[in-house]
């Protein structure tokens, strides 16, 4: 209510009536209205690495996840400046298998390789950790499919 009253006062102060009774904008500015600056801080607690991993594993382990939610989760995960932990990738690959979405499994593995960037030891480590899951689900790596040469 105070904000509305201040706006009404500011509008009234910036208009004047001429001799015919018509309202016109005043040539001089009205009284200055104090604007309070607000700082936007994140007051929430920081998410730990374990909580982050658990959140994404839970997301991909949803039994009723659909293809759109899967792609949305993968795309969101890709935007982070990090390589996902193997347990997150494992959950995502299992979600792909539940949906029979082979293309997404290959895309996930390609993204992991791309996110590793110049650190050549990360991708082989992730594949080594995921090898039992890849064998269980019958998923081939992009290298096994020959996609790394394309």
UniProtKB/Swiss-Prot annotation:
GO terms for molecular function: cytochrome-c oxidase activity; electron transfer activity; metal ion binding. In response to mitochondrial stress, the precursor protein is ubiquitinated by the SIFI complex in the cytoplasm before mitochondrial import, leading to its degradation. Within the SIFI complex, UBR4 initiates ubiquitin chain that are further elongated or branched by KCMF1. GO terms for biological process: cellular respiration; mitochondrial electron transport, cytochrome c to oxygen. The modification Phosphothreonine is found at residue 141. It is a peripheral membrane protein. Component of the cytochrome c oxidase (complex IV, CIV), a multisubunit enzyme composed of 14 subunits. The complex is composed of a catalytic core of 3 subunits MT-CO1, MT-CO2 and MT-CO3, encoded in the mitochondrial DNA, and 11 supernumerary subunits COX4I1 (or COX4I2), COX5A, COX5B, COX6A1 (or COX6A2), COX6B1 (or COX6B2), COX6C, COX7A2 (or COX7A1), COX7B, COX7C, COX8A and NDUFA4, which are encoded in the nuclear genome. Keywords: Acetylation, Disease variant, Heme, Iron, Membrane, Metal-binding, Mitochondrion, Mitochondrion inner membrane, Phosphoprotein, Primary mitochondrial disease, Transit peptide, Ubl conjugation. A motif (SIFI-degron) lies at residues 2-17. Pathway: Energy metabolism; oxidative phosphorylation. It comes from the Eukaryota. This is Cytochrome c oxidase subunit 5A, mitochondrial. Component of the cytochrome c oxidase, the last enzyme in the mitochondrial electron transport chain which drives oxidative phosphorylation. The respiratory chain contains 3 multisubunit complexes succinate dehydrogenase (complex II, CII), ubiquinol-cytochrome c oxidoreductase (cytochrome b-c1 complex, complex III, CIII) and cytochrome c oxidase (complex IV, CIV), that cooperate to transfer electrons derived from NADH and succinate to molecular oxygen, creating an electrochemical gradient over the inner membrane that drives transmembrane transport and the ATP synthase. Belongs to the cytochrome c oxidase subunit 5A family. It is linked to Mitochondrial complex IV deficiency, nuclear type 20: An autosomal recessive mitochondrial disorder with onset in early infancy. MC4DN20 is characterized by pulmonary arterial hypertension, poor feeding, failure to thrive, hypotonia, delayed development, increased serum lactate and metabolic acidosis. Death in infancy occurs due to cardiorespiratory failure. Patient tissues show variably decreased levels and activity of mitochondrial respiratory complex IV. The modification N6-acetyllysine is found at residues 87, 113. The keyword Heme applies. Changing residue 107 to C: In MC4DN20; decreased protein abundance in patient fibroblasts; decreased proteins abundance of mitochondrial respiratory chain complex IV in patient fibroblasts; no effect on respiratory chain complex IV assembly in patient fibroblasts; increased protein abundance of S1 complex IV intermediate in patient fibroblasts. It is found in: Mitochondrion inner membrane. GO terms for cellular component: mitochondrial inner membrane; mitochondrial intermembrane space; mitochondrial membrane; mitochondrion; respiratory chain complex IV. It comes from Homo sapiens.
């Amino acid at each position: 209510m105070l904000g509305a009253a201040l706006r009404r006062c500011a509008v009234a102060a910036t208009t004047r009536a001429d001799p015919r009774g018509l309202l016109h904008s005043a040539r001089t500015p009205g009284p200055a209205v104090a604007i309070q600056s607000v700082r936007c801080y994140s007051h929430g607690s920081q998410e730990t690495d374990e909580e982050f991993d658990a959140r994404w594993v839970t997301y991909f382990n949803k039994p009723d996840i659909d293809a759109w939610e899967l792609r949305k989760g993968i795309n969101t995960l890709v935007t982070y400046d990090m390589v996902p932990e193997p347990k997150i990738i494992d959950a995502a690959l299992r979600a792909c298998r539940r949906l029979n979405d082979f293309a997404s499994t290959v895309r996930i593995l390609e993204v992991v390789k791309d996110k590793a960037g110049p650190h050549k030891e990360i991708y082989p480590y992730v594949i080594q950790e995921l090898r039992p899951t890849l064998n269980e689900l019958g998923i081939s790596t992009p290298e096994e499919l020959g996609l790394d040469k394309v």
